[in-house]
Amino acid sequence: MVVVETPVFTRQICAFLPDDEYRRLQLALVLRPEQGALVPKGQGLRKLRWGQPGRGKRGGLRILYYWDKEADTVYLLFAFEKSNQADLTSDQAKAIGRLIREELR
């Protein structure tokens, strides 16, 4: 399994998680890439809830990623805190879905 990060994701995740916790996230996705919920209209985009130290899953992060099963690759696209944005808007999901369709498939 290959894990690829977008530059945006790298900046975001470095601000949210210490290195050891980020390694746990990567390992969790390598072991079970299907665990994130599929985002409607997201062209295969998945959203994973990930706890931050001291906050748990509910108040933690949302990790947006795309799993290309055939290429055995997980693309880490965006990370955000639930306290800043609870969910994607329909327009955001469509835009990211377009990116996946045009660039990653």
Residue ranges and their predicted role:
Residues R58-I63:
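Short, surface-exposed coil-to-beta transition loops
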Residues C14-L17, P53, Q85:
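Amphipathic alpha-helical interaction elements
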